[in-house]
Amino acid sequence: MSATHAATQEWLVSVDDHVLEPPHVWQDRLPARFKDVGPRIVTDDAGEAWLFEGKRIATTGLAAAAGKKREEFSPMPVTYADMREGCYEPKARVADMTKAGVLASLCFPSFPRFCGQTFTEADDRELGLLCVQAYNDWMIDEWCGTEPGRLIPMIILPLWDPLLAAAEIERTAAKG
């Protein structure tokens, strides 16, 4: 975007933009012993979904409504192939934002749910903490690191333990 365009454009700041985490987020970051129970995308007769600790969690069309007309919104499960690339790829998201006149976006999780509930409800607390940290590292370094200032991270916390939550705030704050 040119400086002239930026100065003359009327811009919005979105404070509630959900990101659809790409399939590699946890598989690239979790220790090997957790790969089989950590979040990963599976495809079976029922379609494509996240699998975490043996629980199958589909992504609905409502979570991937970006770029669609209201009448196309659907609560039915969707695949990554059905989604607009800007739902899960940061450079494409920034291009979509620029086209829509959005200067900055506060980025919220989707699969981890509100405040990282998916990991708060994990059977294995160690795995839950590692998933929280993996998500935050990805969100800060990879997603928001693509375009600092335009993509703003909303971290998640291990809400089951106040000391772990404080430590995660300090750890992520140190990342910038």
Predicted segments — roles?
Residues 1-176:
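Helix-coil boundary/capping segments in enzymes
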